[in-house]
């Protein structure tokens, strides 16, 4: 009788522990997010140091990888798109070589600079690589990526699933904007795939990795100042509704070139990440549990001369300035504060 009671008690305890382990499959996990390296080999014709430090992108990305490799207990790295200058094969090869130097797995998503621009009679466009070819370069490195697909899912830890999205539209030159279309939309086929993937992973924690945001980051993004409406998805409301339906909490993006910060919309936390290639040149270290997320933003290692050049070129640029970022001391300060975001260099949130 005593033995029977003991076995029953042991069974109950085992079931409780098993349930607990399934509910919280990962206890704490550390990872890094980087974005917009815009790799361009310095010897490439036409590469310069402008707003994007084209001649320095190789060095800046190498330095970042070296620093990331010093982080203890790191599990993986996320790369939020705009991998290259404009999908040049030599730049893809170079980025692959640099990222392969990471000591942990890395996972990429594609940005608007990772597909070939469409030739236009009013603007010469070099023919570079198809986005399917760019994505294919990372098969075997970004787990879950398969031939013929530009988006994928992968279980990066027990019951922690990464879902990457391909947000970019065709790179068609838009004469009235004087720019290639760098906007975003999740097409119907990808939306169906996303819902099926979310449905299959309802009991797991989800991280969405995308280049374009599903939210605007300033009034200029909403009002289409300098074509800034292209910084976030055309069908953002539809995408957010689907993510909310399946209880997604975290969406990580790049593209906007502003320092790390987040918005909470419908209980979803939308994070944006700075570029490695433009001022303020940063990456972000995260620690995550099933209940909360903390982060710390780090500067990319570079010489004082490089930092001075990056800031000088940043301040000289007009296109990236918002409507209230006038070329005055006060306007410059607002411009710097918006991109640097000193109040969000570190933080912690608990999911609702």
Q: Where are the regions a protein language model picked out?
A:
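Active-site-proximal beta-strand elements of phosphoester/diester hydrolases
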Residues: 28-44, 159-173, 209, 269-274, ...
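Extended active-site neighborhood of metal-dependent phosphoesterases/phosphodiesterases
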Residues: 89-200, 244, 266, 270, ...
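A short C-terminal boundary segment appended to hydrolase-like catalytic domains
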Residues: 289-352
């Amino acid at each position: 009788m005593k033995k029977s009671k003991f076995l029953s008690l042991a069974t109950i305890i085992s079931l409780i522990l098993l349930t607990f382990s399934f509910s919280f499959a990962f206890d704490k996990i550390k990872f890094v997010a980087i974005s917009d390296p815009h790799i361009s080999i310095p010897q490439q014709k036409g590469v310069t140091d402008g707003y994007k430090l084209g001649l320095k992108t190789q060095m800046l990305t190498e330095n970042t990888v070296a620093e990331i490799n010093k982080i203890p207990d790191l599990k993986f790295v996320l790369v939020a798109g705009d991998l290259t200058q404009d999908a040049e094969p030599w730049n893809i090869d170079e980025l692959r070589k640099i990222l392969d130097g990471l000591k942990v797995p890395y996972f990429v998503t594609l940005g608007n600079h990772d597909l070939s621009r469409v030739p236009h009679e009013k603007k010469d466009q070099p023919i570079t690589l198809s986005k399917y070819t760019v994505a294919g370069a990372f098969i075997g490195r970004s787990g879950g990526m398969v031939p013929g697909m530009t988006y994928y899912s992968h279980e990066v830890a027990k019951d922690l699933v990464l879902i990457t999205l391909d947000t970019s539209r065709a790179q068609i030159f838009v004469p009235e904007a004087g720019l290639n279309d760098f906007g975003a939309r999740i097409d119907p086929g990808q939306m169906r795939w996303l819902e099926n993937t979310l449905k299959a992973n309802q009991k797991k924690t989800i991280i969405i990795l995308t280049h374009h945001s599903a939210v605007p980051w300033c009034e200029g993004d909403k009002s289409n100042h300098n074509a800034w409406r292209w910084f976030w998805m055309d069908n953002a409301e539809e995408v957010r509704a689907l993510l909310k339906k399946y209880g997604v909490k975290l969406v990580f993006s790049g593209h906007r070139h502003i320092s790390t910060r987040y918005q909470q919309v419908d209980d979803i936390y939308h994070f944006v990440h700075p570029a490695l290639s433009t001022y303020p040149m940063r990456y972000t270290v995260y620690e995550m549990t099933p209940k909360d997320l903390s982060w710390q933003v780090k500067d990319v290692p570079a010489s004082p001369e490089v930092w001075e050049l990056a800031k000088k070129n940043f301040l000289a640029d007009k296109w990236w300035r918002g409507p209230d970022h006038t070329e005055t001391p006060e306007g410059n300060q607002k411009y710097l504060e918006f991109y640097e975001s000193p109040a969000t260099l570190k933080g912690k949130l608990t999911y609702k």
